[in-house]
Amino acid sequence: APAESRPALRMVPEMKDLAQKLLERGFDVWAFSLSGQHAALEAAKLYGLHPTRVVGLRNKILNGALTAETLNPVPEGYGQAEAVALLIGRNPVLAVGKPQDAALLDTDDGDGLRVLLAAKDGPDAAAARAKGWVVQPPFSPVRDPQQPDAPNAP
């Protein structure tokens, strides 16, 4: 019998709702991911994001072959902030990220809203609040068809 597999891409309903509301109100919504560019593009479809607004890890192509060399900016740490400056040209009005995205969240000239996805009483929460960031507990992704797994039927 063939092996069953689950979809590797998971969507976070609250983030999709936020992205959709921002898009409906005319905001330019971008996604930065350390996932490969192709996987990031597929995931962005779940959120309704335009493919030109998705930045994933990109590898150099040499003589038609994919190499192990990554292209800058690498969308992680300070590379995220570099990508924002390079591709958007200004600090974001809203940035949402995890503790490892602190460099991106720090790209604030005082006018933007920053949301850290972390435990409210976790080690990063106090530092985030001291910077004026909102601390939001992380959301749980759900699997296709975008509903929590049902308990096993007897």
Could you tell me what each predicted segment is?
Residues 1-154:
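C-terminal cap/substrate-recognition subdomain and adjoining C-terminal extension
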